[in-house]
Amino acid sequence: MQYDHILVRYGELTLKSGNRNTFINQLKSNIKYALIPLTGYKVNANRDRMYVEITEDADAEEIMKRISKVFGVHSVSPVVKVEKNIDQIKSSAVKLARDIDAPGVTFKVDAKRSDKGFPYDTFALQQELGGEILSNIEHLTVDVKNPDYKLLVEIRSDAAYLYSRVIKGAGGLPVGTGGKTLLMLSGGIDSPVAGIEVMKRGVTIEAIHFHSPPFTSEEAKQKVIDLTRIMAETTGEIKLHLVPFTDIQKMIHKKVPENLTMTSTRRMMLKIADRFARQIDAKALVNGENLGQVASQTLGSMYAINAVTNLPILRPLLTLDKDEIIIKAKEIGTFDTSIQPFEDCCTIFTPKNPKTNPRLDKVESFEAGTDFDAMIEEAVANIETLTISKHTNTKKEFEDLL
């Protein structure tokens, strides 16, 4: 069957009556971005649905695959659009049914009619189409309770639409409708997943990464660039901010007892992220912390670390099991990159016996003897920024940076 349109159903946008047009326009823009550089389509949107016209030579399957990954899309279907003429509708229904024709296969016609002026009511239309299919196709039988396939027909104001497939979308809200956050992006499994999870709620992210050459390698930096590109595949450009962290990290290990260095390191990172977030007008920080997963992610550690900022910290992975996070990482395509064996600055100086319940007053007293604020200001001033998109040649970006 040659389809001529792809039907895109909105998710939670239907609940946003006051801002619906803003959400729809953003979703339309995001879908157009996701479809680059494909050809043979035209995106049309209204308050209830979005229809993507496709030409005969368009790659319909690839178009649907890409659209289904865009946040804000509830589901997609390849559809045939015909005039609201019963004979044309019958003819198209039979053609659709031939695609599923096989011995023992059952079907059901499910009709919806938003155009109440159409001469057939829902029940009558279902009977007409079901009878036409049974008269023309040998093997199919009707099962209204548990069919193998549903043939769906929508009678709308402009035309009739027929389809038999419904492909689940990514859900959530369109990226760009929920404000800006700053993602603390390591090279590990968790933080890219956290970034995707908040983007699903319509939030735009910029990412900040701490690197400590020569203790961290250039390959570790490249890995973070690659992770950013993967996250940007369906959401548009993402700015990646690279923080020189070597001097601060060396000073921490010189001035702070070993079992508190992890806590102090995280505090300095958070101070830098806090200051930079305010510069770019980000309203919250995001990280991949998971309660109890490591020493720095116990409640006691979080309390001591969080004391340096009053910005909201979003932790979308807080209560997930590691296996659940890994599944999500594989689904979004970051897992294989995340497990590349290049250490980041969080792992190179890991103490043997880190404090899991550090006292805030003790951490502050050890830090007070050093002018970390001046070092933080210098680190923020020397941040390097890359703008990454799915079209970015990340290897070239990396070489240009060097």
Curated annotation (Swiss-Prot):
Gene Ontology molecular function: ATP binding; CCA tRNA nucleotidyltransferase activity; tRNA binding; tRNA-uracil-4 sulfurtransferase activity
Main location: cytoplasm
GO cellular component terms listed in the entry, alphabetical order: cytosol
Domain of life, per lineage: Bacteria
Enzyme Commission identifier(s): 2.8.1.4
Subcellular location field: Cytoplasm
PROSITE patterns membership: THUMP (PS51165)
Keywords, ordered alphabetically: ATP-binding, Cytoplasm, Nucleotide-binding, RNA-binding, Thiamine biosynthesis, Transferase, tRNA-binding
Protein name: Probable tRNA sulfurtransferase
Organism: Macrococcus caseolyticus (strain JCSC5402)
Lineage: Bacteria, Bacillati, Bacillota, Bacilli, Bacillales
Designated gene of the protein: thiI
